[in-house]
Amino acid sequence: MAKIGVEPSLTDVQEALKERGYDVVPLRGEQDARGCDCCVITGLDANIAGIHNIVTSGPVIEASGLTAEEICQKVEEKLR
């Protein structure tokens, strides 16, 4: 299953993705994003640790204003 990086403050999203079988890793910095198929960030820092620019070639989803369910749907859409 895909490896999804999620900011630590998004615990509900982490749990929802784990329930769907994804390998979830907390994004604390640039190193954590390496090898992720997709990253979910809060949007407070839209370029957390350079993730948009360098580290991951996968999609980056901004979680602000979305429910955990909506984020899971976006992850699934992006990984198709």
UniProtKB/Swiss-Prot annotation:
Pfam families linked: UPF0180
Coiled-coil intervals: none
Signal peptide: none
InterPro entries: UPF0180
Superkingdom: Bacteria
Family label: Belongs to the UPF0180 family.
Protein name: UPF0180 protein GK1051
